[in-house]
Amino acid sequence: YDLTPAYDLLNTSLHMQGLENSRMALDLFKNEGDFATPFFEANGFYGTVDFMEFAKRIGVVEKRAARFIKLTIDSVPAMEEMLEKSFLSEKGKAEYKKSIQDRAKALSL
């Protein structure tokens, strides 16, 4: 047997009743009390500046973190192509695609 390239990916937001608008399972800065970047305070969701701050705090080189974020945004068409080949219902595919696009847009802001 071979595992699929995305065997560990699961968009839990499609399955969590009442949490449909939650973009992440965990807060990036949970142990930081009331810490929030200006971007998060203004928008209510994480964007590139938040992930860059998180990367800095855990010791990821800035250039590497920026490259990974760009790779993630650039991979959206491949994600959508893989999604179309999935066995999700058409409704599930549409919800998943919207989720991918919303998250990519947040990273692009």
Annotate each predicted stretch with a short phrase:
Residues 1-109:
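Anionic ligand-binding catalytic core segments
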